[in-house]
Design a protein with these regions (language model features):
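Extracellular/periplasmic catalytic domains that process cell-envelope and extracellular macromolecules
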Residues: 64-67, 88-89, 116-117, 157, ...
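Catalytic His-Asp segment of secreted/periplasmic serine-dependent ester chemistry enzymes
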Residues: 170-230
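Generic structural signal for well-ordered alpha-helices
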Residues: 111, 147-152, 185
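N-terminal secretory targeting modules
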Residues: 1-71, 87
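Non-membrane alpha-helical structural segments and their capping/turn regions in soluble enzymes
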Residues: 137-148, 178, 182, 228
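Active-site segments of SGNH/GDSL-like serine hydrolases
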Residues: 126-132, 152-183, 204-208
């Protein structure tokens, strides 16, 4: 369901040949002195925990002859576990630079590997592990700041292409986090509406049934990731 909605949405926008010419680079929207304070974060852990996957992407990048693509996907396991992504997105050419457990913090640290030196026509960002109900979580405000840091950097490197921010999705495994997810989604939606070149895509609303309850038939057994119905 999420996949079909997004595929249709993305394809329509990619067909708009004038879109890229109309995108303007916004001024930096994040203002801070020296650093963003983040609690419960071990720098070594966040730097090295997924180094194996980053090394694999570095190896791929060295042998990648054509770095152009219609869509560059950045994010966490919900992108990584989209098993049929190449088939579902066909005939669009995609490049996936996602890894399970990715958070905004390590995505920024690994930015040069996962997000630079490519030639995409659009970029999709989906990451939700900064608000996952763990001791390492950021606050909603910190998460929003890191989203802006990431999108600002993407827009500096790719000033003429559209960037799609997928909303946080509710899940059975993280139901207690839904109130925070709704707040961050509201912030991201407003931010995208005021920033040229950014588009917010709501993938949360369609996961509820007619009774207002979160659907159970669209999740894998872990209650977090989507199955083929989702």
């Amino acid at each position: 369901m999420i996949k079909s909605i997004f595929i249709t949405f993305c394809t329509v926008l990619l067909c708009c040949n004038t879109l890229a010419a109309e995108v303007q680079t916004p001024q930096d929207s994040v203002r801070f002195s020296e650093y963003l304070p983040v609690r419960h974060t071990d720098p070594v852990t966040w730097v090295t925990r997924y180094q194996g996957e980053i090394d694999r992407y570095q190896t791929e990048n060295r042998t990648l002859r054509d770095t152009s693509c219609n869509v560059l996907f950045l994010g966490s396991s919900s992108i990584n576990l989209w098993d049929n992504i190449y088939r579902d997105m066909a005939p669009l050419k995609i490049l996936r630079r996602s890894y399970g457990g990715a958070a905004l913090r390590d995505m920024l640290y690994n930015y040069d590997v996962i997000a630079r030196e490519y030639h995409p026509r659009s970029i999709v960002v989906y990451v939700e592990n900064d608000l996952a109900g763990t001791p390492e979580d950021l606050t909603v405000g910190e998460t929003f700041d890191f989203f802006r840091l990431l999108t600002n950097r993407l827009q500096r490197d790719y000033p003429d292409i559209p960037i799609f921010i997928l909303s946080y999705k509710p899940s059975l495994a993280r139901k207690e986090m839904i109130p925070k997810h709704e707040i961050i989604n509201t912030l991201l939606k407003e931010y995208a509406s005021k920033t040229d070149g950014l588009t917010y895509v709501d993938v949360a609303s369609c996961l509820y049934g007619a009774n207002g309850e979160l659907r159970k038939d669209i999740f894998k057994p872990d209650g977090l990731h989507m199955n083929q119905n989702g």
